[in-house]
Amino acid sequence: MRKIIHIDMDCFYAAIEMRDDPSLRHIPIAVGGNADRRGVISTANYPARRFGVRSAMSTAMALKLCPQLKVLPGRMALYREVSRHIHQILSRYTEWIEPLSLDEAYLNVTDSHHCYGSATLIAQEIRQSIFDELQLTASAGIAPVKFLAKIASDINKPNGQYVIPPDRVADFIKVLPLRKIPGVGKVMVQRLANMGLETCSDVQKYDVIVLVKQLGKFGQVLWDRCHGIDERLVNPDRLRKSIGVERTLARDIHQWEQCTELIESLYLELEKRLSNVKPDLRIARQGIKLKFDDFQLTTQEHVHPLLDKQDLLQLAQKTWTSRREGRGVRLVGLHVTLQDPEIERQLLLEW
């Protein structure tokens, strides 16, 4: 049976700012963009969260919810440096580390001899080391599979941990709300509720064939999760699957010519980022993103073998014409999906 730990730093960016300036500790703060420039919140501390401030929320909305909120611009170079230090701490216990972002990672400690092989004690020691060396707190979840470890890490936040041992998995899952499963968002929660499914126990009683017919591939994934199945390994060589660039505008745009100028600028940035990963600019798909002044988001993409500016412009113009409906546009983004390395390798093999 595997022993998986999910380490999740507590309000990471904000925690670093509070560490470096103790006067911020007991007031609501957030790291994010300027409200005048249509900024977005990256993270908020717990005093701010009590007012309803959340990540990915517009800074303007956050300030409406919490007028006294102090919004800091963020120091990404420092956050990356701290993240590297955290990774060094994790690597003392296992080489099987899968970073998910700067502030969270999975560890497989199944074969670790540290702390007598106890995943619970390893997680405690990691969290203590992070605090001793960086004066930051982390939460942890311990379980036999990845998705349960991730769910568990959220249960005793902040600065806590939760263990789901193998003999408690079945009971834990039975009462688990479907909204707690990673990948089940608000739209899917409503769709499942319309099908009479609200907990994992409900899905366990559902015919898997019918579920797949109704939900496609995700139906099988959901059925597996509701039975405690997650075969995904902790992957230290996790590869980037996509690259994107986007810009939130200080003022809404209403003219296609304005959008064209922005896409020209974004394309140069996307091309530069992609060339660092794929010098030949080969991709699997490319697409565009538009967010309107009512915050509705639309994304369009299609299969394309190479990064292609003209194709992106055509796709964007088609989306602009068919989806905008007179609304202003507050965000424009471009993205590419990279080729699966295994598929790419197979395509290069000789017959």
Swiss-Prot record:
Substrate discrimination (site feature) positions: 13
Entries under PROSITE patterns matching the protein? UMUC
Active site residues of this protein:
104
| EC number of the protein | 2.7.7.7
Q: Tell me, which GO biological process terms does this entry list?
A: DNA-templated DNA replication; error-prone translesion synthesis; SOS response
Short name of one Pfam family for this protein?
A: IMS_C
DNA damage: present as a keyword of the record?
Answer: yes
Under Gene Ontology molecular function, one entry of this record is: DNA-directed DNA polymerase activity
Q: Give the record's GO CC terms.
A: cytosol
The cofactor binding remark recorded in the entry reads: Binds 2 magnesium ions per subunit.
Which coenzymes or cofactors are required?
Mg(2+)
Name all UmuC domain ranges.
4-185
Amino acids binding Mg(2+): 8, 103
UniProt KW keywords? Cytoplasm, DNA damage, DNA repair, DNA replication, DNA-binding, DNA-directed DNA polymerase, Magnesium, Metal-binding, Mutator protein, Nucleotidyltransferase, Transferase
Where can this protein be found? Cytoplasm
Catalytic activity field: DNA(n) + a 2'-deoxyribonucleoside 5'-triphosphate = DNA(n+1) + diphosphate
Subunit record text: Monomer.
Family in the record: Belongs to the DNA polymerase type-Y family.
- HAMAP family for the chain: DNApol_IV
Q: What does this protein do?
A: Poorly processive, error-prone DNA polymerase involved in untargeted mutagenesis. Copies undamaged DNA at stalled replication forks, which arise in vivo from mismatched or misaligned primer ends. These misaligned primers can be extended by PolIV. Exhibits no 3'-5' exonuclease (proofreading) activity. May be involved in translesional synthesis, in conjunction with the beta clamp from PolIII.
Protein's name in the database: DNA polymerase IV
Organism per entry: Photorhabdus laumondii subsp. laumondii (strain DSM 15139 / CIP 105565 / TT01)
* The gene coding this protein: dinB
